[in-house]
């Protein structure tokens, strides 16, 4: 942006702020009788001067996430709750089908000790776990960055490579394809199995489907939410505790007064094996 562009941008900010200033003055004149309403000015997509995010229409960006400045995000990717992608001093590129999970920070480097100008480049079908930090580095297609991992300037995570959860990857480290690195500082741990490589790709696909569900829920209007709540209430199963709170007494037909393990008709209920979730 040239000098004239910056001047126009600054004047535009002044004009936009005039209404806010008048509102504040009016509130002060009302004294102790004034009513103040503090509104959140959070914006999911925010420009920095003339640099604005370029986001595909099929991308899910959670309402509490922030995508700022020179950021490009490809089709089918998802930016989850609390994430910040800050392309203010350099650019960020996120490929297609990539998921950047909750509370992750992605930033860039304009200057550092080595003097390199480093954008952040994240490829296709990448999974970035919760609360990771990715700064001025490259993550290639089908890679996996574990929860809480930190990748510093100049790091390259090659295709089908994995960074273990909680790891700190030092500057200018290259993690070769098919390897797992972990620790602080991160070092080679072992080779990925074929099953783990398939899992990484499947993880990205799972998040594409999950993002569609969240996008649908977040796009609902207030009226839709109220209608759905009324329907749930209308068709909710009324148990004895619910009825007793309302003072309702229902008669149960004699043919339905059966032990819990017996169905109508005298057939026993098949025993369902328990499932343990990790």
UniProtKB/Swiss-Prot annotation:
Q: Where does substrate bind?
A: 86-88, 101-102, 209
Please provide, in alphabetical order, the Gene Ontology terms of the cellular component aspect for this entry.
mitochondrial membrane; mitochondrion; nucleus; respiratory chain complex I
Residue numbers binding Zn(2+): 107, 130, 135
The answer to whether keyword Transit peptide applies is yes
Q: Which Pfam families match?
A: Hexapep
Its membrane topology: Peripheral membrane protein
List the cofactors: Zn(2+)
Primary localisation category: mitochondrion
Phenotype of the disruptant?
Reduced levels of complex I and supercomplex I + III(2) in mitochondrion. Reduced growth rates and respiration of suspension cell culture.
Q: In which tissues is it expressed?
A: Constitutively expressed in roots and leaves, with higher levels in flowers, particularly in tapetal tissue of anthers, inflorescence (IM) and floral meristems (FM).
Entry EC no(s)? 4.2.1.-
On subunit structure and binding partners, the annotation says:
Homotrimer. Component of the mitochondrial oxidoreductase respiratory chain complex I; element of the extra matrix-exposed domain, which is attached to the membrane arm of this complex. Interacts with GAMMACAL1 and GAMMACAL2.
Function as written in the Swiss-Prot or TrEMBL entry: Enzyme involved in the catabolism of H(2)CO(3) but that does not mediates the reversible hydration of carbon dioxide. Mediates complex I assembly in mitochondria and respiration. Binds HCO(3)-. Required for male fertility during anther development and dehiscence to regulate the secondary thickenings of the endothecial cell wall, probably by modulating H(2)O(2)-dependent lignin polymerization.
Q: What is this protein called?
A: Gamma carbonic anhydrase 2, mitochondrial
């Amino acid at each position: 942006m040239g000098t004239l562009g910056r001047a126009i941008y600054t004047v535009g900010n002044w004009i936009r702020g005039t209404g806010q200033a008048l509102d504040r003055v009016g509130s002060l004149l009302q004294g102790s009788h004034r009513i103040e309403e503090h509104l959140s000015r959070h914006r999911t997509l925010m420009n920095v001067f003339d640099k604005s995010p370029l986001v595909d229409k099929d991308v899910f960006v959670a309402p509490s996430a922030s995508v700022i400045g020179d950021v490009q995000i490809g089709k089918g990717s998802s930016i989850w709750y609390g994430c910040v992608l800050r392309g203010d001093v350099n650019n960020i590129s996120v490929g297609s089908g990539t998921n950047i999970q909750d509370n992750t920070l992605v930033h860039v480097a304009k200057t550092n000790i080595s003097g390199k100008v480093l954008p952040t480049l994240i490829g296709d079908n990448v999974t970035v776990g919760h609360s990771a930090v990715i700064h001025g580095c490259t993550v290639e297609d089908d890679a996996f960055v574990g929860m809480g991992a930190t990748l510093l300037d100049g790091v390259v995570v090659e295709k089908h490579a994995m960074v273990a959860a909680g790891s700190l990857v030092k500057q200018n480290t290259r993690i070769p394809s098919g390897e797992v690195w972990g620790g602080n500082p991160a070092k080679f741990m072992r080779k990925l199995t074929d099953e783990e490589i398939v899992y990484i790709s499947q993880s990205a696909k799972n998040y594409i489907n999950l993002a569609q569900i969240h996008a649908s829920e977040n796009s609902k209007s207030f009226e839709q939410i109220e209608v759905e709540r009324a329907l749930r209430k209308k068709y909710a199963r009324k148990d004895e505790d619910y009825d007793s709170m309302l003072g309702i007494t229902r008669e149960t037909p004699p043919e339905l007064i059966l032990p819990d393990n017996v169905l109508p008709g005298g057939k026993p209920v098949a025993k369902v094996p328990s499932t343990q979730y990790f």
